[in-house]
């Protein structure tokens, strides 16, 4: 997870070895999170960008999907994906453009860019929050065959369970909200 600064990060070789295990079905959660910069600048987040690039390369080499987290960092998140190449319409390199932007909280423009790169968009209990009207508008923009729902457990329980520990048992509230849109 992008918030795990200081955690010993596996090398690309480590990731490739781990990904070879039969139970491994994806690479991530990876991405960029600039939400809590505090006194630091975006330049101080180079460790996140380096880690993200390593995970993208692991996905490319293993042909596994990426699980991408982006928060207050969508421009860099998308730019690094594009730099990596191998995306939809790029026949010169092996496709890596599969995976999901999980717990999506960005704009319709970011959703369009992610969809154009071949990714799915997943929404969590946040879409049930009163304050998430803009995000609910994005839900309506995502094609149903590219839309996923999730818990992001143990966080972000949907209304009427907001503030409690989230659980997969609460996914029906997210599905209900999507259906109503």
What are these regions (language model features)?
Residues 1-181:
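Mid-domain alpha/beta scaffold segments of enzyme catalytic cores
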